[in-house]
Curated annotation (Swiss-Prot):
Similarity comment: Belongs to the SIS family. GmhA subfamily.
GO BP annotations, alphabetical order: carbohydrate metabolic process; D-glycero-D-manno-heptose 7-phosphate biosynthetic process
GO cellular component: cytoplasm
Cofactor: Zn(2+)
Function: Catalyzes the isomerization of sedoheptulose 7-phosphate in D-glycero-D-manno-heptose 7-phosphate.
Protein source organism: Serratia proteamaculans (strain 568)
Domain of life (superkingdom): Bacteria
GO MF annotations, alphabetized: carbohydrate derivative binding; D-sedoheptulose 7-phosphate isomerase activity; zinc ion binding
Protein name in the entry: Phosphoheptose isomerase
Binding locations of Zn(2+): 61, 65, 172, 180
Gene expressing this chain: gmhA
Domain SIS: 37-193
Cofactor note: Binds 1 zinc ion per subunit.
CDD domains with a match to the protein in the record: SIS_GmhA (cd05006)
Length: 193
């Protein structure tokens, strides 16, 4: 009944992944991001992650697998997803939604920490404001974006960009894979002397 649609969706996902894999810049960006994060952890820093909608879920998933576990048991790593509902609703109400992440970064971000901002379009105003707040704190910035990087293009120390111009779900599929690889590489870096 839906076999053709299912195959079409899976083929499009596979094609998007293949294009991402075949661009060496993407592989290099993931490696640089993992080393940047591990270096921050080794120096006593933390990562603060944020996103909207599905990207918000990815930011939470990233933090959870760093503080909890990925595949193997190991010490937890310092990671916070900006997801506290009371903070989000307070700042949205009192300042506006575009400040929900930047206010948090202003409050808890420190020099040596890393901000991970996730936006499939690269145009999320509240992520852009969080990047500005992170820069003001002396933090490093990693972004996961899509399409042409949007307004966030060029704003990060490391940008992992999925150059897909269709629906956001294809970009999110690559983002979650990149997140899992980041965690795997961070774990390898953390056991180095």
């Amino acid at each position: 009944m839906y076999h053709d649609l299912i195959r079409s969706e899976l083929n499009e996902a596979a094609d998007t992944l293949a294009k991402f894999i075949n661009d060496d810049a993407n592989i290099d960006a993931i490696q640089r991001a993992a080393v940047l994060l591990a270096d921050s952890f080794k120096a006593g820093g933390k990562v603060i992650s944020c996103g909207n909608g599905g990207s918000h879920c990815d930011a939470m998933h990233f933090a959870e697998e760093l503080t909890g576990r990925y595949r193997e048991n190991r010490p937890g790593y310092p990671a916070i997803a900006i997801s506290d509902v009371s903070h989000l609703s307070c700042v949205s109400n009192d300042f506006g939604y575009e400040y929900v992440f930047s206010r948090y970064v202003e409050a808890v971000g420190r020099e040596g920490d890393v901000l991970l901002g996730i936006s499939t379009s690269g145009n999320s105003g509240n992520i852009i404001k969080a990047i500005e707040a992170a820069r003001a704190k002396g933090m490093k910035v990693i972004t996961l974006t899509g399409k042409d990087g949007g307004k966030m293009a060029g704003s990060a120390d490391v940008e992992i960009r999925v150059p897909h111009f269709g629906y956001a779900d294809r970009i999110q599929e690559i983002h979650i894979k990149a997140i899992h690889i980041l965690i795997q590489l961070i774990e390898k870096e953390m056991v180095k002397a």
